[in-house]
Structures are given as structure tokens and as C-alpha cells.
Amino acid sequence: MEDTHRSRTLQTLGLLTRGALHQIANPLVALVGSAELALGELDPGTKAHDRVALTHRTGTEIAEIVRALQGFVRLQAHGPERLSLSAAATDAIGLVSKVIPIHGVTLTTSGDATVVAPPGDVGSDLVELLVEALETADGTVELAVREEGGDAVVLATGGGERRFPAAAA
């Protein structure tokens, strides 16, 4: 019963997140576009130009975060497909580095393995693994991908791993 409730809660959270991201993205496009047009009308070096340039840069950064989160949420609807775990790990690193402050920490991947799994499940597992590793990180977090006994394994520096059934060759 508790698993069913948790599943419904997560599904509701996903729907709300998708809707919120959409509602944020639309006015953000107008904000960034208006700032870009205004920059062309202002003299460089003026306070007004600098303020509008800051608005444009900040809006662009927020738009990148929104796009990354939208992509992550969209993955949740995909069924199983053939995936490179290294590519999925790189995508997870891209998302985490956009939305979580990771100052002084380098995120890297090494190795590769292929799995057949829903990309949303793989992405969620890898983001969770990264977040756990970042809690104790001191310098570098590496996601090492390898095949081990019929499984594709992703190991995080400092502990933690996720296992997926390796795809048949």
C-alpha cells in the first residue's frame, strides 16, 4: 500500500514539475528576447546596458536549467531502449552541474557499457548516485562504468554504485 501511495505521489510531483517548468519557460523566452532586443538599443558601457546585459545572462542561465530539467522529466515517459551508460552518466553530470552548486568539485566519467532500460529510470538512478557522492565529495567525483558478471555497473568515487542488466551483444 505504501509503495502505491509513493508511486502516485511521485507521479503527481512529475506532473506538477512538468507544468511548472512549462509555465516558467514561456515568460522566460519573452524576458530573454526582450533583453536581447533592448541591448541593441542601448549604448555599451552605460549602466542601463550593463543592467540589461545582466538580465539577459541571468535569464539565459535560468533557461538552460529549465531546458535540462524538462529533458530529464521527458525521459521519464520513455520505455526501455538500448543505452550507453557512459552517455547517460555524462547527461546526469550535465543536469546535476546545472542545478546543484558543485563549487570545487569536478565531475567525470570513464568506461562504458550498454544496457536496455527506460532512460528515465537510468537517469534517475545516476542523478541519485551523483547527489549521494557529492555529499561526501572532496575534489573529484568520477562515475566509472564497467561490465561485471553480466551486469553494467556504475561506481561513484567515494562509494555507491548502481547495477543494470547489461545488454546482449
Each PLM stretch: what is its role?
Residues 1-23, 32:
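Conserved HAMP-HisKA connector
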Residues 29, 33, 40, 46-169:
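Core catalytic ATP-binding domain of two-component histidine kinases
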